Design a protein with these regions (language model features):
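Hinge/beta->alpha junction and helix N-cap segments in small-molecule ligand-binding domains
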Residues: 69-80, 100-108, 161-172, 188-234, ...
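Short hydrophobic segments within beta-strands
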Residues: 66, 101, 126, 148, ...
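Short acidic/polar active-site loop segments enriched in Thr and Asp
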Residues: 15, 61, 121, 182-185, ...
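Alpha-helical recognition/docking segments in bacterial nutrient-uptake
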Residues: 58, 62-175, 238-240
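Flexible loop/turn connectors
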Residues: 234-339
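N-terminal helix-turn-helix DNA-binding module of bacterial transcription factors
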Residues: 1-61, 337
């Protein structure tokens, strides 16, 4: 039987009028009472018709871009600013405002601040700030949101996310190196929990494992922080092997810059003795010596796509789309060109 407002009031030991005021976020109700009532609503899986109606018809003319500001590396990467530019271009066309908000998945006030308050019509969410409970609650309320980047876990059929086709990119990089005559391909990635790095690694492994004379690729895989220092350290580890790799795919161009420096410090010629390919073309890849072959990721267009899909959800045009991807473009430069 469907849960009613009477059930909520009884379970919370408050009056029906108090529940109604909580639904309307009335300032006369204490935050403690609001949180208590909302927790019971969630527990009893109650979707108030008033919220559903207001979410559908009342517009704040504002969408949120939710990031975890604890992840400082995200803000050092130009990827973030290009992505924002794409999102803002679509938001502007719809005469909406784009609000950047700091949140992490440990913030218990997430739903109160952004959903029940009706301050936003929809959200673009970085995977690092989302967990399964929040995703389920947003779906239950039919609140429009799009995850920008591959989620760490399966949130369910109704959840939509957009990303670069990182798996295809890993395969493109590996195939390019093979075409150039390299045979011992290595991979420098970020931490194992990072779904982006994992997808890029999977694309690389799909190609390497299919080789007629397959090598043990696990010996040529190193994972760590995605920065220059770790790129330098991981590349040196590989070069210390009895049979070192003759080429390497880097998860981003910060790691590639570290790998290139490691080779240079050892007097290893690139591309003669070591081929290097990186994900991300900007900012370092075109300006190193030699210039690094890169998988160019159109992050501006990724921001455009994510925001267009979000507005489709807000306007209830295509709510069922679960995954959209953009294929990277391989830009061949001196670091891997043998032919």
């Amino acid at each position: 039987m469907k849960t009613t407002i009477n059930d909520i009031a009884k379970a919370a030991n408050v009056a029906k009028s108090t529940v109604s005021k909580v639904l309307n976020d009335a300032p006369t109700i204490s935050e403690a009472t609001k949180q208590k009532v909302r927790a019971i609503m969630k527990e009893l899986q109650y979707t108030p018709s008033s919220i559903a109606t207001q979410l559908a018809r009342r517009s704040s003319m504002n969408i949120g871009f939710l990031m975890n500001f604890d992840r400082k590396d995200d803000f050092l990467n130009p990827f973030f600013y290009s992505l924002l530019g794409g999102a803002e271009s679509v938001t502007f066309e719809h005469q909406y405002e784009l609000t950047i908000s700091n949140i992490n998945n440990r913030d218990n006030d997430f739903m109160n601040q952004y959903v029940y308050s009706k301050k936003l019509d929809g959200m673009l969410i970085n995977p690092s700030v989302l967990d399964k409970d929040i995703a389920k609650e947003l779906e239950r309320l039919a609140f429009p949101f799009v995850i920008v980047g591959q989620p760490k876990e399966d949130y369910g059929v109704g959840v939509t996310w957009v990303d670069i086709d990182n798996n295809a990119g890993g395969s493109m990089a590996a195939n390019h190196l093979l075409e150039q005559g390299y045979s011992r391909l290595a991979f420098l990635g970020s931490n194992p929990e990072d779904p982006i790095s994992h997808s890029r690694l999977t694309g690389y492994q799909n190609v390497v494992s299919s080789l007629r004379e397959a090598v043990d690729s696990s010996a040529y895989i190193r994972l760590g922080e995605a920065n220059e220092a770790h790129g330098y350290r991981m590349m040196n580890e590989l070069l210390d092997l009895e049979i070192p790799p003759d080429s390497v795919i880097c998860v981003n161009n910060f790691v590639a810059f570290g790998a290139l420096k490691a080779a240079s410090d050892r007097g290893i010629r690139v591309p003669g003795q070591l081929g290097i390919v990186t994900f991300d073309n900007y900012p370092l890849a075109p300006y190193t010596t030699p210039a690094i072959t890169a998988l160019d990721i159109d992050t501006f267009n990724l921001g455009v796509l994510a925001t267009e899909v979000l507005f489709d959800k807000i306007e209830q045009l295509e709510p069922g789309r679960q995954f959209q991807s953009i294929k990277p473009e391989l830009i061949v430069r001196e670091s891997s060109r043998r032919k």
